[in-house]
Regions:
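A generic alpha-helix surface/boundary motif
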Residues: 18, 42-43, 93-95, 111
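An active-site-proximal "capping" alpha-helix that borders the catalytic cofactor pocket
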Residues: 41, 87-102
């Protein structure tokens, strides 16, 4: 009986993530570059989390945060004329709270995701595996999208990446030699 309950929870969470994914695509309608960005961050975050064998609740938080981590970008562009990381951290959490609440996400999940959004461009005092994996996934995508040098990749590898699989992917994507 317990297995059926767990399977039902997993199915419900997958459905919630799919609804969130579609809601984010709708939110970013017409901005294919940003849609591609959060889709790639989600893919890497999920891969790293699964390979690192995180528990299911942590995986759900990581996936939710990866889909919504840049939710404040358009608001920042409208309010400030730019969308730097600190501004995203400022504007994103309230937007995520509203969206996650509308989609029926539990309060504890929403609160952790809001925290991760509020800190995903802050690389000191990373206080959880979900935070670490989100930062690594975002770095993997940003390094490629921004065309950073091998020296910059190596610096990020040494200073930012902590998980075994985040490091592995970073090395293989960038062909850096450690």
């Amino acid at each position: 009986m317990k297995n059926l309950a767990v399977q039902s929870d997993v199915t419900q969470n997958i459905n919630m993530l799919n609804k969130l994914h579609m809601a984010m695509i709708e939110l970013y309608k017409g901005d294919s570059r940003r849609i591609q960005h959060f889709c790639k961050v989600h893919s890497y975050a999920r891969l790293i989390a699964q390979m690192e064998n995180v528990d299911y609740k942590t995986l759900f938080i990581i996936e939710t945060a990866a889909l919504t981590h840049d939710i404040g970008i358009h608001t920042c562009e409208e309010k400030y004329g730019e969308c730097g990381g600190r501004l995203q951290e400022k504007e994103g959490p309230a937007l995520a709270k509203e969206l996650l609440e509308r989609l029926g996400f539990e309060t504890d999940i929403s609160e952790r995701v809001q925290y991760l959004i509020a800190h995903h461009h802050t690389y000191s005092n990373i206080d959880g595996i979900d935070y670490q994996m989100l930062v690594e996934a975002d770095f993997l995508v940003n390094m490629y999208e921004d065309g950073v040098s091998k020296d910059a990749v190596l610096k990020a590898y040494n200073n930012i990446f902590k998980t075994e699989y985040g490091k592995y992917i970073c090395k293989d994507l960038s062909l850096i030699h450690i």
